[in-house]
Amino acid sequence: MRVIDASGAIYGRLSAYVAKRLLEGEEITIVNASKAVITGNKEFIIEKFKERLDIGSVRKGPYYPKTPENILRRSIGDMLPKKITKGKEALARCRVYRNTPPDIEKEKVEKVDGVVTDKVSGIITLGDLSKELGGY
């Protein structure tokens, strides 16, 4: 089992990296999902996510997540072929946590190369986005 720290990681790049590893058969646990970031204009990102929430109805959906861990898990799931068994099993091997749980603190946590922000202007964390959507 691999434990990946999402602190400062770019949301889409991290999701693509994890989805690929899940299809290869690895079990992956992601911690600190609320600290993952989306790059771009903060107001535009919030507006786009709120537009998604307004689509459909309460009874029929589609249902979009509001919490950081579910937003990240949904983006990973959207990159997997869910209609076939391989994709369903891959998503079942993925665990996402808002913070670091006590039982995982003891394990080796790694950062993924190439997905961490260094000098990017205009970012919003999934935790802040979740607060704007009303899901924290």
Curated annotation (Swiss-Prot):
What's in the keyword line of the UniProt record?
Ribonucleoprotein, Ribosomal protein
Cellular-component GO terms for this entry: cytosolic large ribosomal subunit
Task: Give the quaternary structure.
Answer: Part of the 50S ribosomal subunit.
What is known about what this protein does? This protein is one of the early assembly proteins of the 50S ribosomal subunit, although it is not seen to bind rRNA by itself. It is important during the early stages of 50S assembly.
Task: Name the protein family.
Answer: Belongs to the universal ribosomal protein uL13 family.
Cross-referenced PANTHER family: LARGE RIBOSOMAL SUBUNIT PROTEIN UL13, RIBOSOMAL PROTEIN L13
Any idea what this protein is called?
A: Large ribosomal subunit protein uL13
Q: Which organism is it from?
A: Thermoplasma acidophilum (strain ATCC 25905 / DSM 1728 / JCM 9062 / NBRC 15155 / AMRC-C165)
**Which gene is annotated as encoding this protein in its UniProt record?**
rpl13
